[in-house]
């Protein structure tokens, strides 16, 4: 059984939100699954050591429609790529007709998808209800990042123990998700007053 999960939302945060459902699908079918995601989901980094994920396929779409999978021709390009992999089952975490068409053109016989054309929804609630209905089991919303223990131990040994090391994920995929920089500064000052700390900023050049 070859299973594909299509998760087209952008950003690391959204990718992590969907992890419990990807893991649940993998456990249900007792096989690692492949995922179709956008590059800025950072799935290649987040899931590098995740045994529930077999292959990470990048969906190249952009806001200005310049990605190789954008437009009508992009539908055929990505469906051709997927068809080569001979998937038996797909879970589509999106209500777009586009991804239904892609799955059908890819020759995937069993398709589970959000209700077509649904746009406004709660990302966590919708994913949870959809997955639980499809798998007929309760799924926790708590995400788990599977990390290589040796890598973690080696990294930990390189840090001084004289103070706490705090990583701040200040990046966001949209303006409604951003927290003002003044809030981060106030938070760091408050933490540092209680516990001497060193802060690391996880963000891009434009954040």
Which residues fall in each region the model found?
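Catalytic machinery of carbohydrate-active enzymes
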Residues: 1-207
